[in-house]
Amino acid sequence: GAGDEWTAADVTRRDDRRAASARRAAAHAARDEWVFEGSGRAVEYVAGRRWEVAATGFWQAHRGAAQRYSDLIAEWADLGPGGRAWDLYSGAGVFAARLAEQTGRTGVVLAVESARPAVADGAAALRDLPWVELRAQRVERWVLEHVGGAAPDVVVLDPPRAGAGKEVIGAVAAAGPARIVHVGCDPAAFARDLSLYQAAGYRLADLRAFDAFPATHHVECLALLAR
C-alpha cells in the first residue's frame, strides 16, 4: 500500500543510519591502545550498581545523565514481577538493570547492543541478574528475528544520533508492546522517529527534555508511547 512506499528521503535517512552504525562499530573495533597512566578503565555508579567500563567506550556525556534517565525509564516502564522487556541499543546495560529489578527472577529482559566491549562490560556488571540476556548483535537484524515471538510489555530504545528509523520502529510496533520508551539526542531525528510510532498506532503519552549537552544544539529527549 501507499503507506509502505519508501521515498528518496527515507532511503537517504536509512543510509545515514547505516553509516552511523558502521562508524559506531568501527569505533569499537579492536585496535591497539596504550595506557600511559592508570588502568584504562573507568568506574561509574548508577542506582547503587557498579560499572567498570573501557575509558574509550561509551558513557553518557553528562555525569548525572545515566542516573536521571534510568530513574525516568524505570518510572515509565512500571513493570511488575514476571514482566518482559527489550532494551535496544543497550550499551553496558544501565537501563536493562533497572528493568530487571522490576521484573524479578520470573521476568525476562533482552538487551541488544552491537558494540561487543560494551556487552562484555554489561555482562560483568549484571552478573547477579541472570534473567537479563545481553546480545552482541545489530538491533536492525535482531528485531526482525524476534517479531512474532513472545511479546514484550515494554521496549526501551536509545539509538545512535541518526535515530532508529523505519525498519526498527516498524518491527518494534509489530511486536506489540504496551509501552515504548524512546531516547534521542538529536531533536530532528527524534521527531522523525516519533512520527513513525504514531503512524503505527502509538500515541505520545509523555515527553521530557534535558539540556545534557550545554552550548550545543543537542537536547536529550525521552518519550513514552502507548497504545
Can you say where each PLM-predicted feature lies in the sequence?
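Accessory RNA-recognition modules of RNA-modification enzymes
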Residues: 1-157, 164-168, 176
